[in-house]
Amino acid sequence: MGSGKTTLARELARALRRPFFDSDQSIRERTGRNGREIAEAEGVEALHRLEADVLHEALGRSTPVVVAAAASVIDDPAVRGALEDTYCVWVTADPEILAERSARGDHRRAVGRTEHLEHRTPLFEQAADLVVDTGNLSESDSMERVLAAIRAP
């Protein structure tokens, strides 16, 4: 939440001429609710299961897509396995920056953000082919970094 992954993924999809898949949007279309509403009504675990389900749906498409997925999906061992066959970019920033940015969005309250980041960082580091820290990068610099890595031999 707040790393800029959706913006970066949308622009990357445009640059690569690939379909863009936003897990938050998919969840809204499927349920009529956003993540905060689902977490409040059904619990955080139900939301995380749904986030993993929509990522599996995106990864199962016949056409390669650029996906903006919730960070919680990395907790699912099946997702980590599926990511082994993809090019995975972990988009992150310092916790303070993430908190400031996500406070402006429609996400659920970020209780335990630091603990989640500490738990998920090694999982993302293992799964990611590229890590982009957007805290000190402009959107265009972040995009250039990803495109350069993808196009490198």
Where do the language-model regions lie?
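The conserved Walker
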Residues: 1
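Conserved glycine(s) of the Walker
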Residues: 4
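Hydrophobic/aromatic beta-strand patches that form the interior of the parallel beta-sheet core
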Residues: 21, 87-89, 130-132
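Structural motif corresponding to alpha-helix initiation and N-cap regions
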Residues: 52, 76-77, 114-118, 140
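Short glycine-rich anion-binding loops that position phosphate/pyrophosphate groups of nucleotides
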Residues: 70-74, 94-96, 137
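A glycine- and Lys/Arg-enriched "phosphate-lid" helix/loop adjacent to the NTP-binding pocket
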Residues: 85-123
